[in-house]
Amino acid sequence: MWRCGGRQGLGVLRRLSGGHAHHRAWRWNSNRACERALQYKLGDKIHGFTVNQVTSVPELFLTAVKLIHDDTGARYLHLAREDTNNLFSVQFRTTPMDSTGVPHILEHTVLCGSQKYPCRDPFFRMLNRSLSTFMNAFTASDYTLYPFSTQNPKDFQNLLSVYLDATFFPCLRELDFWQEGWRLEHENPRDPQTALVFKGVVFNEMKGAFTDNERIFSQHLQNRLLPDHTYSVVSGGDPLCILELTWEQLKQFHATHYHPSNARFFTYGNFPLEQHLKQIHEEALSKFQKIEPSTAVPAQTPWDKPREFQITCGPDSFATDPSKQTTVSVSFLLPDITDTFEAFTLSLLSSLLTSGPNSPFYKALIESGLGTDFSPDVGYNGYTREAYFSVGLQGIAEKDIETVRSLVDRTIDEVVEKGFEDDRIEALLHKIEIQMKHQSTSFGLMLTSYIASCWNHDGDPVELLKLGNQLAKFRQCLQENPKFLQEKVKQYFKNNQHKLTLSMRPDDKYHEKQAQVEATKLKQKVEALSPGDRQQIYEKGLELRTQQSKPQDASCLPALKVSDIEPTIPVTELDVVLTAGDIPVQYCAQPTNGMVYFRAFSSLNTLPEELRPYVPLFCSVLTKLGCGLLDYREQAQQIELKTGGMSASPHVLPDDSHMDTYEQGVLFSSLCLDRNLPDMMHLWSEIFNNPCFEEEEHFKVLVKMTAQELTNAIPDSGHLYASIRAGRTLTPAGDLQETFSGMDRVRLMKRIAEMTDIKPILRKLPRIKKHLLNGDNMRCSVNATPQQMSQTEKAVEDFLRSIGRSKKERRPVRPHTVEKPVPSSSGGDAHVPHGSQIIRKLVTEPTFKPWQMKTHFLMPFPVNYVGECIRTVPYMDPDHASLKILARLMTAKFLHTEIREKGGAYGGGAKLSHNGIFSLYSYRDPNTIETLQSFGKAVDWAKSGKFTQQDIDEAKLSVFSTVDAPIAPSNKGMDYFLYGLSDGMKQAHREQLFAVSHDKLLAVSNRYLGTGKSTHSLAILGPENPKIAKDPSWTIR
């Protein structure tokens, strides 16, 4: 996977949500792993490594142990923390000097087989032989990272063995290079009369990546600002330059870059360090001697005067104003990221300059009305050796480029003169305190990503983690010099000659020109072929297709057994009590580290139908327009000072027993330090009772930003949009899901953003508020420590008594609603006093009939996103478990080969959602009709039963790795709160998963897949397709 970017701001502190179930208890009150690690001493010799630093980092509850490998000089960092979700990563400094994508294609190809594990594609096969909570690989601008995580010690050793062999001893076969990188091949590899075309997974991935105008801008920004060395090229590969890479060059790059002397090893969690060191030394490092890698990145030569560049991109078909599609930014080169305190200071400074409606650049640029949103890469970018700061606007008229540049300069002058308000600095430091206390299930992954860039350039990763020291020093600098930050702005922005103004305008023929250049390149390569070359291409194509189609013996790979999976789930203790009369509140006592997490769910059943499409917009602006006596700036300041964020989001929650029944509502979410709980609940009180819907100008700004963000998300999420659309006509909830989260929402926001008079939309918000922001049909949830519960109960009760209630009961808009009490299980998962259980008010449509719809959304992309959805059964139906295993089986044993390996798409597969919709999808796919045919073949394959018990067991392991993914303390009990899923119901489903057999898979394949057009729907996002255009059964949008 290629990523243009890395650590931005305080990336380590960004919250990542947990999974949907947790298999082992969190033990943050224990520090056994830290204490064990503190026993190591400087100079200790352990399995070929020498300890050279042991440091306690109490603010992150960990002990850091730095080591060096004696024979190779390989660096090693172990972070001991009492976390069961253990992580390993190995990182190589990869510094390409051209845009052929060699590090990216190498990242793909090393995972295609190795000396110890010579079977094809061991990486993807391990997804089904493991209980990993994460497996992937990333190519950044100057390093390549291979991380995995798991909670199972045996699994950790298995995955470590595969990763070590893949990275240090890969096969690097020519056919794998052809498949993953690029190749010339006949359109139909079995017919030499068909045209020769370019194919390859990375080739298509990068074509897809550069359909995203934000990616194009970000890539050029880095290339132009840092032109001297490796940052001047595209590490992921420019599609047209990829076509120049040879297999020999790939092997040479591995030989010079994938060596222990150029490697950094990282482990995290509560597994013993000695076992890791022993295995890494014996299986990999003992076979190497030290070299001096010539991979260092030299410092960029500073400019003596600012520079300007203009680039072009494809047009935005969702632009709210076609004459305003230009992007411009002003960027400044900053110091080396290995100066950790300076990097920390500049990261904070960046947030003060650009984050939220009180920041100087928000006021000057966003509220100018010139554009729709900040330019890409706004703020501090710390993922290159020297960081940079960038700020500007997208969605502007070309004539306003100079105006934006002047506004940037003027804002810098004002900040130098006036500085920042104390409250804004305190709010930012409060945010850091919250983020240090908040516990993510993916903390190890966050840490390895956070330290990667600094460590890559020989900075001290442990210093980077000592956030307490950095904060103390920052406060001291401010105290000793009140103009500390103003002087930084003057030094790095006002007086900085290394300054780039980059502008990007749309070219209506951009994609056409790119296609023409590719066609010319193809013509040149084809014309240069001799008859012998053509014959060799034909034979190689046949050989590759034969290899892809041949059953692979993966017995060489290590694997867990189904018996390694825990048979039962742990109990989650919950208390549900009625508060303020009849509002159920769920309390979940957890080790939240001094944090309180509050949520409320409010039903939309009484909301008039014509207001329903505007609910997502209502949610996105609710906490940003002001409330009570606070205007929107003051509200933003209070939210930053007193909470870790307050948000609202629409939800369509499926029933667990009926496909045509669902719950609709809005989830309100927030978190805070326990000392600020009364203030947070008071803010919710004001938002519910006295929201401000009069600020028309700021509402316009928020509408434009939302519309722009939705449009920008399409290239990365096209497969999700296709699946949501394809599921629209299969269940009653599907139509609402499309309204809330699909292309219908994107198009509606575009229309609203285009309106010259936005008052009619603004007037809808108080009407929605009347039905939503009250105590009717509401339930609440709190996660906090046991010690905080009494204080929490009082604060929540005060909030619930303060909010309005309807004088008379409003009738639901939909005629059929049912009241469904949420069950409590005998397993002790929820203590529910008699008469106070949660009652969900569900919408049901007993006469609903599914129907088929085929939609092709025309997009200016050179790749496609294809989705097919099939209506099956709800969660509690025993067939749901079989279909879940079947989806994984079809992905691993059929669709991966057909769609990715043969078809060249970046991704594809099958999945079963909680709502009973079975989806087949592809991502960044050069094909459409062929992919739909592959979906059909996958169904035929499933119905044929050509899979073994070993295949079924592997699919179960893969499914359980998701089912048993860790859940953070903040998210415990959420399945019960939102979906009504008790531990007893989840245990029953778990037993159904264990019981899935060959006969059951065969039965559900024949019963649900391919049974009739009415239960299937299709959607595609992508370029025009002549075959689809001629087919009257398709709707073209």
From Swiss-Prot:
Composition bias type Basic residues, residue spans: 804-814
InterPro entries: Metalloenz_LuxS/M16, Pept_M16_N, Peptidase_M16_C, Peptidase_M16C_assoc, PreP_C
A GO-annotated cellular component: mitochondrial matrix
Activity regulation note: Mainly exists in a closed and catalytically competent conformation but a closed-to-open switch allows substrate entry into the catalytic chamber. Substrate binding induces closure and dimerization. A disulfide bond may lock the enzyme in a closed conformation preventing substrate entry into the catalytic chamber, participating in redox regulation of the enzyme. Inhibited by metal-chelating agents. Inhibited by nickel and zinc excess, and slightly activated by manganese.
Modified-residue entries (N6-acetyllysine), positions: 759, 770, 884
The record's account of how the chain is modified after translation: A disulfide bond locks the enzyme in the closed conformation preventing substrate entry into the catalytic chamber.
Span of the transit peptide along the chain: 1-15
Cofactor details (free text): Binds 1 zinc ion per subunit.
Disulfide bond residue pairs: 119-556
GO molecular function term, any single one: metalloendopeptidase activity
Enzyme Commission (EC) number: 3.4.24.-
UniProt-listed Pfam families: M16C_assoc (PF08367), Peptidase_M16 (PF00675), Peptidase_M16_C (PF05193), PreP_C (PF22516)
One GO biological process term: proteolysis
Presence of the UniProt keyword Phosphoprotein in the record: no
Enzyme class: hydrolase
Family classification: Belongs to the peptidase M16 family. PreP subfamily.
Function field: Metalloendopeptidase of the mitochondrial matrix that functions in peptide cleavage and degradation rather than in protein processing. Has an ATP-independent activity. Specifically cleaves peptides in the range of 5 to 65 residues. Shows a preference for cleavage after small polar residues and before basic residues, but without any positional preference. Degrades the transit peptides of mitochondrial proteins after their cleavage. Also degrades other unstructured peptides.
Subunit structure: Monomer and homodimer; homodimerization is induced by binding of the substrate.
Protein name listed in UniProt: Presequence protease, mitochondrial
Upper lineage: Eukaryota, Metazoa, Chordata, Craniata, Vertebrata
